[in-house]
Design a protein with these regions (language model features):
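Short, well-structured N-terminal submotif of metal-dependent ribonuclease cores
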Residues: 1-42, 54, 58-66, 142-144
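Structured helix-beta-strand junction loops
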Residues: 33-34, 75, 114, 132
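Active-site neighborhoods of divalent-metal-dependent phosphate/nucleic-acid chemistry enzymes
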Residues: 77-121
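Short, conserved alpha-helical segments within structured domains
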Residues: 40-44, 64, 86-89, 107
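Phosphate- and divalent-cation-binding pockets in alpha/beta enzyme and binding domains
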Residues: 22, 46, 89, 127-128
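Acidic, PIN/NYN-like endoribonuclease modules and their adjacent C-terminal/linker elements
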Residues: 2, 96, 108-144
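Active-site-proximal, substrate-binding regions of enzyme catalytic domains
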Residues: 48-78, 88
Length: 144
């Protein structure tokens, strides 16, 4: 089963966030299912930004951010290069979801293109998708 994961969910694997335990349980479940994990290249930049923000907030030290980034780059998550097709689909999704920015829509468009599940730590995004009839989007809070 193909799965697209977003940066918010991934950051929970490194930083102490309210949904860190669920993120670990989800990753264990996906490994057991032998899921293929994917993310748009944007994912790396969003994770880097999250680590930097954690440094700025004093949650982690700069050296930890560097170590986390190295560990992140070693994860078995396929980075899917940008394409015109994905960008156009992301624009359509951003418009459909009423988003002012199209970052989240990149993950949605990729999941749609790969016929994959989308797992996110963004409850509002997932609820918005479900209200649009999308049954392949899941919030980390669904993990027990």
């Amino acid at each position: 089963m193909a799965v697209v994961i977003d940066a918010n969910l991934t950051l929970a694997l490194f930083l102490r966030l309210p949904y860190t335990e669920q993120a670990y349980r989800l990753m264990d479940h996906l490994r057991e299912r032998r899921s293929t994990l994917s993310a748009p290249v944007l994912w790396e930049y969003e994770c880097l930004s999250g680590f930097h923000r954690a440094v700025q907030l004093g949650a982690i030290r700069p050296q930890q951010a560097a170590e986390f980034m190295n560990d992140l780059l070693a994860l078995e998550i396929e980075r899917v290069d940008p394409s015109v097709e994905n960008h156009l689909a992301a624009l359509r999704w951003a418009e459909r979801l009423g988003q002012s920015k199209a970052y989240d829509a990149q993950y949605v468009a990729l999941a749609e293109r790969l016929s994959a599940e989308l797992w996110s730590a963004d409850e509002r995004l997932v609820n918005n998708l479900k209200s649009q009839g999308v049954d392949w989007a899941h919030w980390i809070g669904e993990v027990s």
